[in-house]
Amino acid sequence: MSDVSPHPPNGIFDLGHWDGVSSFMTAGHGPLPLNCDWAWRAAEFYQSNAISQISSPQSGMDIGPSSKLFYNGTDGQISVFADVPAMGSGPIGLGLAIYEFTGDFLSLAFAVPDAAAQGMTKFTLFQCDVMTVVDHPVTFYLRLNVRYAATVATFTQAVKTSGGHVCATFDLGFHRFEVGEFSKIWLDVMINSPQHNRIIVNDLTLLRHPWGQF
């Protein structure tokens, strides 16, 4: 089942005023922003040599410590590369150069640490912030996947961008969960009509807010 979050695209956490943003963006850890009990930054965006340089990668191939690339179609021309972003982002960017591409989808799948699901309840809100550079405007579909018991709930938000900051907020309270424990979370960054475009993800963070406690 898929739920679309009604929250505004700017999100509820202002990372620009997060005192711990510098250390967190540089090393993947640091003080948490206000009202958050867990935060994560993908290793691709702070670890040296974390991103594999790949020409014509196969679908399902690992491209970093926590990321895989998925797509359909057999005649796509895709390159994966590391990029040095401008100031204000992480020290490393994950780049995709997409040329001829006839498939229906292209997606970056990020494995989220198990700690994200520990102590989580249905009264939880997640915010995903992504910094991007694109040659041409593009639509991202940010999807949070939550496994509980033997079921997976998905929360999807579409964001259009010409580059810069995009944000999606996923409120688990809008889904009716059956009895069971939360066990796993992963994040998909799906790209609509990616052909003839150069897309660089300069940063990706995921924040957890237990709103039921307030």
Residue ranges, per PLM feature:
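Activation corresponds to long, low-complexity, non-globular regions
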Residues: 1-73, 213-214
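Secreted extracellular polysaccharide-interacting domains
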Residues: 98-121, 149-151
